[in-house]
């Protein structure tokens, strides 16, 4: 089933490529051959289907980079009746693989933008603006044949845009040269109206781009953790054990703030609020599981300090340095932070200067009692 869908997509997308209407002749003798083996060549394709009639052209579509077959091709018969012979045969097998021949339909050319028209699009209208306001404004440029505002069926209010049809195309050119017009103290945009066939692909592209933008905003809004840094470590800092000079959780993400150890959204998007609630619960659980966060009492802090392990053993012949010793001369002017990982990891030393604020000094003193 998936192979048939893929073949249909290949036929629709690559059949004749982007061509102008003059380059898209409807050749009744041309067939699309899908499901080809990677070993099938134009010669073998011609040899197999040549039994049904004289072939004027046979080709296998290849990747422009790798030059490998893309698994489909085309056969053009001199006599269109040969196509019926191929289709009535039923199953076809070429180079040990079942192939799927179909009638090749030319791809419809993309409609071009309209450059001469009597109708204009008017967008950005204010809510109080009426149809009479629009007519009275544009009548100064020339006679109007028709005007309309697009209304919402549920609210029965116009949707902020409409169309105006003039009697002359020259008037449209004059109006669109100005581009922006002021109606009821609001600037509105005027453009030449385009057929639906032209606007549909453009609107589809905008919708896809908006979807990607919304997805990106959601992903960044959730506070995706940087690669290579454990989530449990950030849980510790979110619980209140941040250090001066160390990156704070949430700073790179403009849609969330870190307040009292909790991630709070800058907007009330339901999906973002729900996701942050899940993340806060996860961070709290991770912090509790790894004994992160501020100690409940000075005695508990002292107990944690007593069981704290230093650097892992080393094979270096040099002396072992106690980074926690107050007598160590190398620790002056630097903040010493234990790694939030279990004791198998070394100590992370930040080279940022000490922050001598009273709050920081109190927290640092409490943590080292």
Curated annotation (Swiss-Prot):
The keyword Repeat applies. The keyword Repeat applies. Residues 1-23, 298-319 are annotated as: Disordered. It comes from the Eukaryota. Keywords: Cytoplasm, Repeat, RNA-binding. Residues 29-108, 118-195 form the RRM domain. GO terms for molecular function: mRNA binding; poly(U) RNA binding; single-stranded RNA binding. GO terms for biological process: regulation of translation; stem cell development. One of its GO terms (cellular component) is cytoplasm. Its main location: cytoplasm. InterPro entries: MSI_RRM2, Nucleotide-bd_a/b_plait_sf, RBD_domain_sf, RRM_dom. It is found in: Cytoplasm. Residues 298-310 have a biased composition (Low complexity). SUPFAM superfamilies: RNA-binding domain, RBD. Pfam families: RRM_1 (PF00076). Belongs to the Musashi family. PANTHER family: RNA-BINDING PROTEIN MUSASHI HOMOLOG RBP6, RRM DOMAIN-CONTAINING PROTEIN. RNA binding protein that regulates the expression of target mRNAs at the translation level. May play a role in the proliferation and maintenance of stem cells in the central nervous system. This is RNA-binding protein Musashi homolog Rbp6. It comes from Drosophila melanogaster (Fruit fly). The lineage of its organism: Eukaryota, Metazoa, Ecdysozoa, Arthropoda, Hexapoda.
